[in-house]
Amino acid sequence: MKYDFKKIEPKWQKKWEDERLFEAKDFSDKPKFYGLVEFPYPSGAGMHVGHIKAYSSMEVLSRKRRMQGYNVLFPIGYDAFGLPTENYAIKTNTHPRVITDANIAKFSNQLKSVGFSFDWSRTVDTSKDDYYKWTQWIFLKLFDHGLVFRDKTLVNYCPHCKVVLSNEDSQGGKCDICHTDVIQLPKDVWYLKITDYADKLLTGLDDVDYPEAIKQQEVNWIGKSTGAFVNFTIDGIDEKLEIYTTRPDTLFGVTFMVMAPEHPLIDKYQDRISNMDAINAYRDECAKKTEFERTQLVKDKTGLKIEGLEAVNPVNGKKIPIFIADYVMMGYGTGAIMAVPAHDQRDWDFAHAFGIDIIEVIQGGDISKEAYTGDGMMVNSEYLNGFDNKKDSIAKMTEILEEKGIGHAGIQFKMKDWAFNRQRYWGEPIPLVHCPKCGVVGVPYEELPLRLPEVKDFEPGEDGKSPLARIESFVNCTCPKCGGPAQRETDTMPQWAGSSWYFLRYCDPHNDKAFADMDKLKYWMPVDWYNGGMEHVTRHLIYSRFWHHFLYDIGEVNTPEPYMKRSAQGMILGSDGEKMSKSRGNVVDPLDIVNQYGADTLRVYVLFMGDYGSAAPWNDSSVKGCRRFLDRVAGLTDIISDDKKAVSYETLLHKTIKKVTDDIEAQKFNTAIAALMTLLNEIYKENRISKENLTIFLKLLSPFAPHITEEIYEMIGGEGFLTVSAWPEYDEAKTIDATVEVGVQVNGKVRAAVSIPAGCDKDTAMAAAKANDRVASFLEGKKIVKEIFVPGKIINIVVK
């Protein structure tokens, strides 16, 4: 058969679409499989090869599961709100809706050209009001349950995008969108109380099948620690200064305290502080730094002593100096820390820089050279002296703190509450109203969606306010509670809002009465397998798990965890081994590969290029190799034979069925394809194949290369569509070779290899070994004293 992919691929894509082969059926009697991929952000650049690899895993699994008789839900949609579109809209003076619609159309055509078996009837667009109505609905539920609050705080702010960023969106001190350095600014921020769900997010990991690396990233990000809250006081003032520590056993070693420069007690008692000018100057310098810069361990130690305030250590009554330093943040813990320089390296460095006392309370190191952070016997600690077990000394100190009313056991999380508002246009309007009489009031549910108003100017104000704040007809409204004059919230939600529940909407995408029907949720949820990028583990994955746990708690979904299994693909690097980027000139456009070699070649290559979970460089010669493989597959039509004589590759055929079946489930796609290549070579050695065996081969290859396999299947008279035909089964007995080759040793040295019947007894094996001419030459004139046979592995004859 001539492999004309430019005719074959559009032909079968149209046939599949016309027959609606990939549309999932609600409430089918078949077992269900819900396979999910991270829906794309529809950028103007269109699809890249990373999308192809990311979607190919679940694509192959979904096609295989359909052939195994499952009712498969494999949906797609678009995460369409976001800053890049809005920035482009500002640059080109084009409405974001127009840009988004064009980009989605482009993306959809590209995805279809690769032949992905998505259920297009369930496509969602997070920027459409019939979708974000329910995003707003979930937000209001969070608000009604006390999980939304507003606070004025230092925030991560991108001066280029003019937007507040969450910690997750500003990792490394850079804006996740434009990579500009983030600065700290005081702003009113809407937060979601994700920290209320920290424990559930941690314990929920015990109930899901995620790779250990993903679980550990989430555990580290949540950062749960156990310790104690301790009440220091300020000398001469009836003022409690609470700190949190994981090491209350070291309280006798505290020699100074450090506050965040923004700590409110500084302003409260500024009249007692003699160096406020210096403190304010230091604060100004801190404001120019990102949170990332402030908290780096490897940097010069900066700080300033507060002249006029001293803290009192509650366990020994000693007065200690109070400093401000940039590395202490108001958003972590209580905004103040106790410092034990003998046993914490950062405190030790700070103490040396500022000439502060260092008191040893744990024996074991030389604190004149560095902090000792190991275990040892407690000293200089009164009632803890002699303790040599950290757990016991912590427990004893915590007990005493509670007895004296100067502290208590506690838990802290590194994860912060989720900064949820953005001062931009292209996002979901936050459905809240500010009333001077009633305070903050939610928009009535029956008035949802609160639609984005039409605007001509999308640029955020120089005051950092949203473009919506300039639209009086949107801002001015009536309070839903008292009927008096009020003003709408003008910030919008972050891009992560719509993606926090999209997997639920796929279950019932056209429902206008609820975000999804509960019976459909019970049928489809949880997601059986979710594949996505490692870069989303501490953002989207945590956010969506949080929303889902909340919806479960209020009875709106049927499972606490949304995803039963999660996997991640490795990155496709440029041919130079570097990350693909336009500046390096190493970007590969997947449609160039489709146009030059065909979609099936691209599909096979991205899964054959290496371990699925690892990064791998693009290799043009390997792409050509995959095309040659498919050319040889097409050539099988030329050696179809009616000869009923057994073929030499029958055992290999059954082995291949088993291997491909198992390897797909294990995401070992490269070895599955390699097994098909090996089988193909053996078929060509025999130079004949029956229609029955060819059909088996085509079925195994179909999830990887569905177009060419459908074409050949039709050509040989196959009934219906190969893509929904039954997956082949192997005969376990036929996966065992009739003969095996084993090495023959004489006195422990390998002298030959012989072929023996698989599963034969010792006598048969020994007879075959002794009949070998080379072995016989080493036995001649010798006395056999021992014969050893390890079935299927080795024969050893001991002589003297």
Describe the residue ranges of each PLM region:
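Residue patterns forming the tRNA-binding/recognition surfaces of aminoacyl-tRNA synthetases
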Residues: 2, 11, 15-19, 91-241, ...
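Helix-rich, typically C-terminal accessory recognition domains appended to large enzymatic cores
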Residues: 79, 144-160, 250, 409-438, ...
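Secondary-structure transition/capping motifs at alpha-helix termini
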Residues: 63-71, 91-97, 109, 113-117, ...
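N-terminal catalytic cores of NTP/NDP-binding nucleotidyl/phosphoryl-transfer enzymes
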Residues: 25-96, 123-138, 245-246, 313-350, ...
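NTP-handling and nucleic-acid-processing catalytic cores
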Residues: 3, 8-13, 49, 135-363, ...
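Conserved oxyanion/phosphate-binding beta-strand-loop segments in alpha/beta enzyme cores
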Residues: 1-36, 66-75, 99-106, 282-323, ...
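Alpha-helical recognition segments enriched in aromatics with Gly/Pro capping
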Residues: 309-315, 319-332, 361, 475-614
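Glycine- and acidic
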Residues: 38-47, 119-124, 329-337, 379-383, ...
